[in-house]
Regions:
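Extended, Lys/Arg-enriched charged tracts that mediate electrostatic binding to polyanionic substrates
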Residues: 15-29
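Helix-start/capping segments and mature chain N-termini
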Residues: 1-5, 27, 34-222
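FAD-binding glycine-rich core of flavoenzymes that anchor FAD
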Residues: 2-19
Length: 222
């Protein structure tokens, strides 16, 4: 009800140009009147709105992503599953290194074995491998994004086989080498649907779908 009222009051900010939207971000911050490390007992709830275009400068063109094999974003038992500011702070150093090398974002591996694909810094990730849509399972260190959920529901309703499971970086590499990785994309409230055209792992570059947007990715975006 608060959100509906807010948007109706600020509807002049809703953009109409193609590829634009009104970004809505609710958040909370603690405001207890003391210092120290403790659970928050009082918080302020805020909603901000902003007209936006594409999250990445590439727009709907495929982005380049670097797989991080040293730093970790989150571990099971922590806050990786939550929309928590600290999760983003933990990803900043690796993100800056990726940007220096010309990559838009970091694709994180699990925090224990550095073996399993988890998520990109600002979005969940999906792959089409030999006709099957594969996305990392929610194991407690991955954000259960609403856009991820929506993509899964849409794809299943249209007859696609969608698997939420562990996906190792080795399996992904084999699919790339064998030509079975047909396309890849990220999805999130800010990025919406963003095609991935290149992955870099340990300084080896892999091009996906010739660096072009895939059919499923385009369909979801449209």
């Amino acid at each position: 009800q608060i959100l509906d009222t807010f948007i109706s009051l600020e509807q002049d900010w809703v953009p109409s140009a193609e590829g634009t939207s009104l970004y809505i971000r609710p958040f909370m911050f603690g405001n207890d009147e003391n210092l120290g490390v403790h659970a928050v007992h009082h918080a302020t709830f805020v909603i901000i709105l902003s007209p936006v275009g594409s999250y990445y400068k590439e727009g709907i063109n495929p982005v380049k992503i670097m797989i991080e094999d040293k730093d970790v974003r989150a571990v099971r038992g922590g806050t990786g599953y939550a929309k928590c500011g600290g999760n983003y702070a933990a990803s900043n150093r690796a993100g800056e290194k990726a940007e220096e090398k010309g990559y838009s974002q970091v694709l994180w591996l699990d925090g224990v074995e550095r073996k399993y694909i988890e998520e990109v810094g600002a979005m969940n990730v999906m792959f089409k491998i030999d006709g099957e849509i594969v996305t990392p399972a929610l194991t407690g260190s991955i954000l259960p994004g609403i856009t991820r959920k929506s993509c899964i529901e849409v794809l299943k309703s249209e007859g696609y086989t969608v698997s939420e499971r562990l996906l190792s970086v080795d399996e992904l590499g084999e699919a790339l080498k064998n030509g079975k990785l047909e396309e890849a994309w990220g999805c999130g409230t800010a990025a919406v649907v963003s095609p991935i055209g290149e992955l870099c792992y340990k300084d080896v570059k892999y091009t996906i779908n010739g660096g072009k947007i895939g059919e499923v990715t385009q369909h979801l975006y449209d």
